[in-house]
Amino acid sequence: MVASAAGALPIKAIDTVSVLSVLREIEAAGVLHTAHQALTTARMIFDFAISIGVLQFNPADRLHKALPRRPKAQHHPALAIDQVGPMLRTLEASGSSPVTKAAIRLALLLGLRDTSLRTLTWGDVDLAGAQLTVRAANMKGRREFSTPLPKQAIAVLKELHALTFRGPDSYLFPGSGKNARVSPSTLGDALKRTGHTVTTHGMRSLLNTYLAECGFRLEAREAQLAHVHGDQTDQAYMRSNFWPHRVEMMQHWGDVVTALEAGKPVPRVEVDKVRRIRAA
């Protein structure tokens, strides 16, 4: 432990009361999550000390019962499928900028994470190849990710190109400052103005749920959402082997979004096509 007087004590002199005292200090500062993290770290340190014969017992054992429980994690509000049309129509009629509207549309059409979306540059976009690539540095798993572009996303990008293209290194969604990109709050505020409690992450949840209900295979959905499984070889296999499946899958999703915004019947999944994709 590094706080309070316990930080200066030899490890053999630290007892349960000393550890609890430090945890109470952290809890009193209003950072309960940090207190739980500190307890976990302390237990690991003391366990190591036991393993090398320095200590006989762990003074941090069972202290988790002395701390209040962590609050339950707040899940990102998911968008229901029947809210997509009203949300998009309200967004289009709102006072949000065309660039912000385009960002939200692409988030819905592609299921990209917030950071991956906001850090995109025009050098990441291949309109002719109907493909968009997110650099490894901008991905949660630090691995480069590519997504097929349905025709709806290509249409959004072509309109956006006229507004924000300043070269391959320029951001798709620039912010107000020099070399800045759009902020998370800008997208969040625009979504709030639609009257729907939803985040870009909630759009990812909708995409996954809906495509699962349509019968598209798990591997294709996991690859599209860039969920990390296995080593780099496994990831390369997932990206390459399921690319044709993802092209079909994401075009179907784009057609669904178009129909919902227009208030028209949602296109049915071609059962035979899905079966072929699942069997491949």
Model-derived features with residue positions:
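Active-site/catalytic core of tyrosine-dependent DNA strand-transfer enzymes
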Residues: 80-85, 129, 138, 148-201, ...
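Basic/aromatic-enriched alpha-helical hairpins
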Residues: 1-29, 45-48
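C-terminal secondary-structure termini that scaffold catalytic or DNA-interacting sites
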Residues: 139, 151-167, 174-179, 214, ...
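Short, polar N-cap/turn motifs at the start of nucleic acid-interacting alpha helices
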Residues: 57, 124-131, 197, 201, ...
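Hydrophobic (often cysteine-bearing) scaffold residues that line and stabilize catalytic clefts
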Residues: 15, 34-41, 80, 99-100, ...
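Basic, Lys/Arg- and aromatic-enriched nucleic-acid-binding interface segment
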Residues: 26-41, 51, 55-120, 128, ...
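C-terminal catalytic core of tyrosine-transesterase DNA break-rejoin enzymes
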Residues: 33, 51, 105-116, 182-186, ...
